[in-house]
Structures are given as C-alpha cells and as structure tokens.
Amino acid sequence: STVTQGTNRTTGVTINAVSGAITLVSAAGSATAASFTVTNSAVAATDVIILNQKSGTDKYDLLVTAVAAGSFEITFRTTGGTTTEQPVINFAVIKAVAA
C-alpha cells in the first residue's frame, strides 16, 4: 500500500496495511524535527514499527515516537540537507505482544 501526504510535512496520513510506503509532501528538507501521525487500523499498541528511507536526495533521521492502537507517529529531520523533494518512507508493522 502507498499513500501521499498532503498540505505540509506535519499532515497526518491514513494507510491501513502492515507494510507500505509514505510519500512526503514536496518541501525543502530541514534539520529541525517534525512529526506526523500515521493512522493505521492494522497497528496495535504493542506492535513494533520499522522505518527506512526508500528515496530522496537528502538523508533523513527517522524515528517512531509513539505507537497506539490504530496509529503511530513518525518524527523526522534531515542530517543537514535542504533539497526540495518528496522522499518516500517505507514502513513495516511487526506484530508483537508485551512480555
């Protein structure tokens, strides 16, 4: 599954799948951290979310900063680049339970 972010880089997206790709809105990269929520009915509060950068000229630090039933939050920033681009973030949900 894929989804493209609208409006700005803090606009949330909805993608109901255990893996997929999120295309960020076109904007200049920034070293200042920004966050957005991914609404996803496949996510449980105990799951683990894996992220990696699929594309983009700039390099991005990608963090999952919250996981809840039905959503997770991505916080990101560039490592210093300011290219205007639409980077793509791949994600995967690892189904887990708290031990």
Where are these regions (language model features)?
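Extracellular receptor-binding modules and their adjoining Ser/Thr/Gly/Asp/Asn-rich linkers
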Residues: S1-D47, K54, Y60, A66-A99
